[in-house]
Each structure stands twice: as C-alpha cells, then as structure tokens.
UniProtKB/Swiss-Prot annotation:
It comes from Elusimicrobium minutum (strain Pei191). Gene3D superfamilies: 3.30.230.10, Histidine kinase-like ATPase, C-terminal domain (3.30.565.10), MutL, C-terminal domain, dimerisation subdomain (3.30.1540.20), MutL, C-terminal domain, regulatory subdomain (3.30.1370.100). InterPro entries: DNA_mismatch_repair_CS, DNA_mismatch_repair_MutL, DNA_mismatch_S5_2-like, HATPase_C_sf, MutL/Mlh/PMS, MutL/Mlh/Pms-like, MutL_C, MutL_C_dimsub. GO terms for biological process: mismatch repair. NCBIfam families: mutl. The lineage of its organism: Bacteria, Pseudomonadati, Elusimicrobiota, Elusimicrobia, Elusimicrobiales. Keywords: DNA damage, DNA repair. This is DNA mismatch repair protein MutL. This protein is involved in the repair of mismatches in DNA. It is required for dam-dependent methyl-directed DNA mismatch repair. May act as a 'molecular matchmaker', a protein that promotes the formation of a stable complex between two or more DNA-binding proteins in an ATP-dependent manner without itself being part of a final effector complex. Belongs to the DNA mismatch repair MutL/HexB family. One of its GO terms (molecular function) is ATP binding. The gene is mutL. GO terms for cellular component: mismatch repair complex. SMART domains: DNA_mis_repair (SM01340), MutL_C (SM00853).
Length: 608
C-alpha cells in the first residue's frame, strides 16, 4: 500500500469542483443565482458551444469592490452567511462560497465588476490560479465569462453529452430562473441567436407568469392555465385543467421561496389531485410556495435541487387538496393575450403531395377510419388507471386482466385461432364477437388494430420499405427551446422512421414528411411531435427503445377507436391480420387483445 500524501491544492480543487459543477448547466445556474442575489433586474446571457466554449452572464446588480472581487474565487468565501446558524434563515440562493471557486478550478475565468460610483476591476483565473487583477470600465454590475470549461479535466469533458443535449439543460436553467424571478428581464443568446427575451414584470404577477409561460410551455398551454391561490404557504399556482393534459411530463415547475426544486412529495401530491387521468397524459403546472427556511432543507446536495420538509405529510396533504379544489371548482383560465412564439400558419386543409413510395396495398380498414386526435385520452374501457402512478419512476407493466363471468384471457396462440369462425357483431362498438367451434371469442378492436399497426410499421422500418409521404405544406410546431434541442438530437434517426423535421427557429420545428402508413390531421401531427419531443428528451435511451416507444404510441393512437363501427369484412380482415402478428394476443403495452368463453362454460352458466 502506498504512503498517504496530502493532495496538491490544484488537484483537490478540481476534485471538489466535480461535486458542485457537473456540466455547463451547473455553471450557468450558479452564475444566475449570484446575479439575482446581487439585486440585478437585467441579466444578459451568451452561450457558445453548448457552454463548453463560453458562458457569459452580465448583470446590473450591486457589483463588487476590488477586495470582494479577489475574494470571490477563494473557497468558502461568501457574503451570504457568517455562522452555522445562518443556514436556518437563508434568503439567498448561493451560500457555500464554493461556486466561483469551483468554476475557476476547471475553466478560464474572468470577472469584471464595479459598484455604483466605484472603480471597475477585472480578475483572470485559469485552472484555479490567479493570473491578473486589472482596472476595467466602472459600469455598475458584474460580467462573468467562463471559457474552455473542463479544459484541464478531460475525463469530465468526455462525460458531457451532445451539444444539443447540453444546450437543452442550459435553456432549462434559464426557464426556471425566468419563472422564479419575474422582476428580472432576461436576454438569452446561443451561438449568436436570440432564444429568449423576457421582459421584467410591471407588477402584474399573473400576467407576467402567463406571458413567460407562453414562451416556455407554449401559447396554447399557457392560455389554458387555471390560476389558484391560498394564503397558506403563500401558495400560487397555474395548472392545466383536466381537459388540457399534455403528452409530456417535463412542463412542470416547483418553486419554494423562488428556488426551483424537484420533489417527489410535491409531484405525487399534484398527480394525486389529477387522479383518473389517462396514464399517458400529464399536467403542466407552475407552483410557487413560500415557507420559513427552517421548515425545509435544500442542503442535501451541493446542487441544491432536492428538498426535504420538516412536515412532509402536511405539505403533501395541503398541495393535493388545494389542487383538487382548483380542478373541480369554478376556476377559469387567466384571460391574458399571448404572443405566439412564431407567426401563426395560414388556415388550410392539411394535405399531402404525391407519396415517394407506393401506398400499402393491404388496407383492411379502407379509408373511412375516423381521424381523431392521435393524443386524445384513451377510452377508459381500454385503460385501467391507478389513483396514482409515480410520474418519475413509472414504467408501464402489462395489465393483469380481470376474469369476469368466467371468461378466459388468451395468452398464447390457441386453438381459438383455428377456423371456421363467424363474425356475429360488436358489443358497445368496441368489442368484436366471433363464434368459433369452441365457443365465443371477443376481440378488443382498438387493441387489435394497435398490435397490427405496430408490427407492420416496425417490419417496414427494419426492412427499409417504409414509405414517406411529403407534406404539401410544412407543419410548424412550437416547443420550449429546451425541447427543440432535445428533438433535434434525433433528427437523423427520425428520418429513418419516416419523419422529416428541421429546426425553423430556436422554438419552432417544421415537419416536412411523415410515414405513409399513418394518416395524420394537422392537429394530430402537432401533438405527436410535442409528445415525441418529451420522449426523446433523454439521450441515454437506446435507439431501439426509442423506436419501440415511438411506434407503440403511433399504433395506439391511430388504431380503430372504441365506439367505431366495423363491417363484417373489416372484422374478418382484422382477425387475419392478428394471426400474422408475432404476438397477436396482446397490444404493444401488454394488454390482452381477446378473451374467450367456451361452450362448456356457457353450458355451466345456464345450469344445463
């Protein structure tokens, strides 16, 4: 065993920096918190190279003297606290005195600052070493430039994901800061392009929140938000009604004392209030709460994202109840005009140009299928929703079918497949009834069509036989800037899946082509892209998993809906299609496609 030695200060600093600064988004978060703590009401942000080349934050806050400027990059130097007891009454974001020290250890850092009426000064620090201190223009405020992040820690640099992904995290930090600090105006540029411009509040809290939500969540969601307030915990929230749930779960924001936080307790409380929602639909919300610093703890980790409450059950119950009352009460959306992120498209019939590949020759359902919104809530007949599924850890499992009236759920390819069989009709326009030699067989027409479309799409995609349908007019889809970055990560793969997209602006994408196996209406296509942007947000997911999720979602939403009439020819064709499937007994989500009732069971039921 080697001898124990004390690490050099520069090595220890780089190791410690990894706890505070994990990626560019962590740097930006610390710089924005410092700017807000300094009393700034205008913050300008420039990002180049996804934050690896440059992160610049300029503010008009109180600024620093020369002495404070040189101390700002020294470890555990802070103006926020003086002793341990101060941790119980914090009203600032930063407090550890580690942020700038950690940033300086793994980058080339420069800080220019001046107090009102004082002289300006600039320091340069590289790899934790002070290079110079020099005069600078005496403009009140502070400008921090972080260049070549992780240049001296290649392992950390290698750990970073693609530029699109890192940019999406950076923009998420800005979105959170902008919602938390309505009195501050923000101007954000990435690689020279203006992405966000938020004007400072004129004192109208609701109006400012809705206007900022219009840029971040999208105008359509923002105008539907319900406003609710309660004196307890200084509670103010903006929630989508049950009729306006979204296909993604990342349009959710919690703030306590203006600090953005993640909390399973808070998230589960809100989801509990939305009980009965289809499991593939999620609320969008912005929740503000205030409470004494001693009643909650964010000092669990240097990132200060997770929170623990002194009275967790009380907070959970309060949030669940007040949200439930808002959803079931007479609350109305806030009546505020929202300027759309991009000019509205001209109203037109959604049409296709000539397809690039032949239309599929086998169309058992013809062209008269009702074209519903592909993300309309699934019928409750097809989905059993628990009171609450953890929105963070939930993974859909095959539903355990109920055995009602002695019916047997088919789980493997049985003799029930064998002919002859005769279509008798449908039950509630949802379940197809067939007579077989063994008895009765009931098929869930929605789940069956879902399975057929799922396998047909996968097969065509894997065999490179997927037909592409170019759109006569591109469809514009507005998204949060962070979601646009996520979606563009998968642009090339989406092309192989039949979807051709391109970025039109920092918050808008264009859809130029779709797979010809699906027939979209414009609204349906827009909602699909919004949902897709949420699903592909995590680049750690393998492309195979992404394919399955994408195909399952499309197949489910474009299958025959419950309550649709099916002719005898269509019913017979559907059964033939199911027999050709690798797994004709289950929908892609694991739910059963059919149940059977044998002649013997019928005889027993009638006591014969």
């Amino acid at each position: 065993m080697g001898k124990i030695k004390i690490l050099e200060e520069s090595v220890a600093a780089r190791i410690a920096a990894g706890e505070v600064i994990e990626r560019p988004a962590g740097v930006l978060k610390e710089l924005l918190e410092n700017a807000v703590d300094a009393g700034a009401d205008t913050i300008n942000i420039d990002i180049d190279g996804a934050g690896k080349k440059l992160i610049r934050v300029n503010d008009n806050g109180s600024g620093m003297s020369k002495e404070d400027l040189t101390l700002s990059v020294v470890r555990h130097s802070t103006s926020k606290i003086k002793n341990f007891e101060d941790l119980d009454s914090l009203d600032t974001f930063g407090f550890r005195g580690e942020a700038l020290y950690s940033v300086a250890a793994v980058s080339k850092l420069s800080i220019s600052s001046a107090e009102e009426g004082g002289s300006g000064n600039k320091i340069i620090v590289e790899g934790g070493k002070l290079i110079s201190v020099s005069p600078s223009p005496n403009i009140k405020g502070t400008t921090v430039e972080v260049k070549d992040l992780f240049y001296n820690t290649p392992a950390r640099l290698k750990f970073l994901k693609s530029d699109n992904y890192e940019r999406s995290l950076l923009l998420k930090v800005v979105e959170e800061s902008a919602l938390a600090n309505l009195h501050v105006s923000y101007n954000v540029r990435t690689d020279g392009r203006l992405v966000y411009s938020f004007l400072a509040s004129n004192g109208d809290f609701k109006k400012t929140v809705i206007q900022r939500a219009g840029q971040i969540l999208g105008a359509e969601i923002a105008v539907s938000l319900i406003s609710v307030e309660d004196e307890r915990f200084g509670f103010k929230a903006f929630l989508t009604p049950l009729s306006k749930l979204t296909a993604v779960r990342d349009l959710q924001f919690f703030f306590i004392n203006k600090r953005p936080l993640t909390s399973k307790t808070l998230q589960q409380a809100v989801y509990k209030a939305y009980h009965g929602r289809p499991k593939d639909r999620h609320p969008a919300f912005i929740v503000f709460m205030n409470m004494p610093a001693a009643d909650f703890d964010v000092n669990i980790h240097p990132q200060k994202r997770d929170v623990k409450f002194a009275q967790e059950n009380a907070v959970f119950g309060f949030l669940m109840n007040v949200t439930q009352r808002a959803l079931t009460g007479a609350a109305q959306p806030v009546d505020i005009n929202i300027t759309p992120a991009s000019p509205p498209a001209a109203t037109m019939e959604f049409s296709f140009a000539k397809p690039r590949a032949e239309e599929p020759s086998y169309k058992p359902f013809g062209q008269n299928i009702v074209e519903e919104n592909v993300f309309a809530p699934i019928s409750k007949q097809a989905v059993v929703v628990k009171d609450f599924e953890d929105p963070v850890s939930y993974n859909p499992e095959p539903a355990e079918p109920k055995k009602e009236m002695g019916a047997h759920v088919q789980t493997d390819n049985p003799s029930w497949w064998q002919g002859p069989y005769r279509f008798l009709g449908s039950l509630h326009k949802s379940y197809l009834i067939y007579e077989t030699e063994l008895g009765l067989m009931l098929v869930d027409q929605h789940a069956a069509r879902e399975r057929v479309l799922y396998e047909e799409y996968l097969k065509k995609m894997e065999e490179n036989e997927l037909g592409i349908q170019p759109l006569m007019f591109p469809v514009t889809v507005d998204l949060p800037a962070s979601n646009v970055e996520n979606l563009m990560l998968w642009k090339d793969w989406l092309k192989t899946a039949g979807f051709e997209i391109e970025q039109f602006s920092p918050r808008t994408v264009l859809v130029n082509a779709v797979p010809n196996i699906f027939r979209f209406k414009e609204d349906s296509l827009k909602e699909f892209i919004v949902s897709l942007a949420g699903i592909v947000g995590d680049p750690l997911k393998s492309s195979d998993e992404l394919k399955k999720k994408t195909v399952a979602m499309l197949a489910c939403k474009k299958s025959i809906k419950a309550k649709e009439d099916v002719s005898m020819a269509e019913a017979d064709a559907l059964l033939l299609d199911l027999k050709r499937c690798q797994d004709g007994m289950h929908c892609p989500h694991g739910r059963p496609v059919m149940v059977s009732l044998s002649a013997a069971e019928l005889t027993k039921k009638f006591g014969r």
